[in-house]
């Protein structure tokens, strides 16, 4: 099968064109038409319905789904591939909701920054799908691929997809997809190539310094790294001989907690507990510049303002226009590989860290729980991390 490059696909999507995305022959082994919602043209839905002939769905990020109160279609998902359908929707200004124009209206409303859940009738004729946060590095499906492509074009994380069917009603595969591509002059890529593209875009890492660092917890070696995807530096402290399997804490910088000992969070206490553990048992702490789960210090303070008005730590980030957690651990995985570490005993309560590291080739040999005392100021925060973010506390 003749495939195009990911860069060619991104250029086509930015022009408002649909492309073909094929998945693994050992998975669904299908081709989907994909368009980015923000860039799509007025004929996109009609083209998909006329020539694709499959179910037109609208992959979106989890943040959009939460913002619009789009709940799962079913309580217990038994789909063999775990596709995360939400309840179907029509925009409230549609009539029947099924026409190409009205499904286009509904799709565009999903990415309207002013839209709320009350702007949609449920059920409807457009089927949102929730993509996993780390895209094809977590799940190699068309849902994640289309949202990854949207992000890579600089658009909001939303797309339209539609399976391509043959004239006889069976799913188009192989030669049929190639013929479809030629007939309609479309770009065609694979999810496998998209996954490789994302992994190959990992930043350049440079080790700049190494010093001895005595602390109240013990003596450490401190390393300084720079990357080409951040203006902020990364610090690593290590104790003992570094082995292929290592005790590791990946800690996101928290000025308020780590430096000013804020009681709004548990970050400072987790850092202290990690340093004590590494001082006693050996290992490494990677200190990443990911303030406020990636939204930055000022936005974190704005989130605190919303929390004082009754929001929780997740809904506050979403209200500011962010996903609940923007962090990615590519740089952490690179640093571990720099030290020859490919397997870790991870000091963490956050399952997303496990998933992200494993997607970058770091094996999680064991989880070391990191439980610290709560207080009257951070109890709601801790409850939200457990109930909404799945933290193991």
UniProtKB/Swiss-Prot annotation:
Residues 1-200 are annotated as: DHBP synthase. Mg(2+) 2 binds at residues 28, 142. GO terms for molecular function: 3,4-dihydroxy-2-butanone-4-phosphate synthase activity; GTP binding; GTP cyclohydrolase II activity; magnesium ion binding; manganese ion binding; zinc ion binding. Keywords: GTP-binding, Hydrolase, Lyase, Magnesium, Manganese, Metal-binding, Multifunctional enzyme, Nucleotide-binding, Riboflavin biosynthesis, Zinc. Its EC number is 4.1.99.12, 3.5.4.25. Residues 201-393 are annotated as: GTP cyclohydrolase II. Coiled coil: none annotated. Zn(2+) binds at residues 254, 265, 267. D-ribulose 5-phosphate binds at residues 27-28, 32, 139-143, 163. The record marks 125, 163 as: Essential for DHBP synthase activity. InterPro entries: DHBP_synth_RibB-like_a/b_dom, DHBP_synthase_RibB, GTP_cyclohydro_II, RibA, RibA-like_sf, Riboflavin_synth_RibBA. The active site is at residues 325, 327. GTP binds at residues 249-253, 270, 291-293, 313, 348, 353. Pfam families: DHBP_synthase, GTP_cyclohydro2. GO terms for biological process: riboflavin biosynthetic process. Disulfide bonds: none annotated. It catalyses: D-ribulose 5-phosphate = (2S)-2-hydroxy-3-oxobutyl phosphate + formate + H(+); GTP + 4 H2O = 2,5-diamino-6-hydroxy-4-(5-phosphoribosylamino)-pyrimidine + formate + 2 phosphate + 3 H(+). One of its GO terms (cellular component) is cytosol. Its cofactor is Mg(2+); Mn(2+); Zn(2+). Pathway: Cofactor biosynthesis; riboflavin biosynthesis; 2-hydroxy-3-oxobutyl phosphate from D-ribulose 5-phosphate: step 1/1; Cofactor biosynthesis; riboflavin biosynthesis; 5-amino-6-(D-ribitylamino)uracil from GTP: step 1/4. HAMAP family: RibA, RibB, RibBA. In the N-terminal section; belongs to the DHBP synthase family. In the C-terminal section; belongs to the GTP cyclohydrolase II family. Catalyzes the conversion of D-ribulose 5-phosphate to formate and 3,4-dihydroxy-2-butanone 4-phosphate. Catalyzes the conversion of GTP to 2,5-diamino-6-ribosylamino-4(3H)-pyrimidinone 5'-phosphate (DARP), formate and pyrophosphate. NCBIfam families: PRK00393.1 (NF001591), ribA (TIGR00505), ribB (TIGR00506). PANTHER family: 3,4-DIHYDROXY-2-BUTANONE 4-PHOSPHATE SYNTHASE (PTHR21327:SF18), GTP CYCLOHYDROLASE II-RELATED (PTHR21327). This is Riboflavin biosynthesis protein RibBA.
């Amino acid at each position: 099968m003749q495939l195009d490059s990911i860069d060619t696909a991104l250029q086509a999507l930015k022009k408002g064109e649909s492309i073909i995305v094929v998945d693994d022959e050992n998975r669904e082994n299908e081709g989907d038409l994909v368009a980015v919602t923000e860039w799509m043209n007025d004929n996109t839905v009609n083209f998909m319905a006329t020539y694709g002939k499959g179910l037109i769905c609208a992959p979106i990020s989890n943040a959009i789904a939460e913002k619009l109160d789009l709940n799962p279609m079913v309580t217990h998902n038994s789909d063999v591939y775990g596709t995360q359908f939400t309840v179907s929707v029509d925009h409230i200004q549609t009539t029947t909701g099924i026409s190409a124009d009205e499904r286009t209206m509904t799709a565009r409303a999903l990415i309207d920054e002013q839209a709320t859940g009350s702007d949609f009738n449920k059920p409807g004729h457009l089927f949102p799908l929730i993509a996993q946060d780390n895209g094809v590095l977590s799940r190699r499906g068309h849902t994640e691929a289309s949202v990854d492509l949207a992000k890579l074009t600089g658009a909001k994380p939303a797309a339209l997809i539609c399976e391509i069917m043959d004239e006889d009603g069976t799913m188009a595969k192989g030669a049929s997809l190639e013929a479809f591509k030629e007939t309609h002059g479309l770009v065609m890529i694979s999810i496998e190539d998209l996954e490789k593209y994302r992994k190959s875009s990992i930043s350049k890492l440079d080790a700049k310094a190494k010093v001895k660092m005595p602390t109240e917890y013990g003596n450490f070696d401190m390393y300084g790294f720079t990357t080409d995807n951040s203006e902020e530096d990364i610090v690593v402290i290590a104790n003992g001989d570094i082995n292929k399997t290592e005790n590791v804490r990946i800690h996101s910088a928290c000025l308020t907690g780590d430096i000013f000992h804020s009681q709004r969070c548990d970050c400072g206490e987790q850092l202290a507990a990690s340093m004590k553990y590494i001082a006693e048992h050996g290992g490494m702490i990677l200190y990443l510049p990911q303030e406020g789960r990636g939204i930055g210090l000022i936005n974190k303070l704005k989130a605190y303002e919303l929390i004082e008005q009754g929001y929780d730590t997740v809904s506050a980030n979403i209200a500011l226009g962010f996903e609940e957690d923007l962090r990615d651990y590519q740089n952490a995985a690179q640093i571990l590989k720099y030290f020859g570490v490919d397997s870790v005993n991870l000091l963490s309560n956050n399952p997303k860290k496990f998933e992200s590291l494993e997607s970058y080739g770091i094996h999680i040999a064991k989880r070391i729980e990191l439980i610290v005392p709560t207080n009257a100021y951070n109890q709601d925060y801790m409850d939200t991390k457990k109930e909404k973010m799945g933290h193991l506390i």
